[in-house]
């Protein structure tokens, strides 16, 4: 996975899942349609309802996502402890439907981090100092490149880059596009070999 795009800097720490997608929009039985309500209480000055589009709302021009220069951004820069609070997979769906492919922050809530990989949204953890540098580049309109294979983030036409850690199984999942079941099936030969060895070494466990 190699993604290049513009980034929007959300300069707020401890953003919780209710701020990402408010609970009143979770009544929908569909998995789609949540992007219109991303950061709802910050993007809009009025109260929305399920089915309302942004064109029917009062836009908060002072919120960073509504600034003209950040329209079309595909990378979200955030601060520490992003997506804390209650567990809701809708938070990931809303970010993806809005157009984000990557979220970069110093840290993420564990459940949100896991949900990202289940849905193909890449969460990248960098230091606060590295995030600060990316904030400046984002505000200048620089394009940011995220290379999952090499595990690094760089800025177009700039020499420096920032490396990030990711578990090998999660990296493989993102690069292959496989879900948990597909990943398990890809290891079927090893699983069968283990089961045969287990049955041979501890046969009493398999007696009826």
Where are the regions that the model predicts?
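Cytosolic catalytic domains that perform sulfur/thiol-centered chemistry
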Residues: 1-79, 83-208
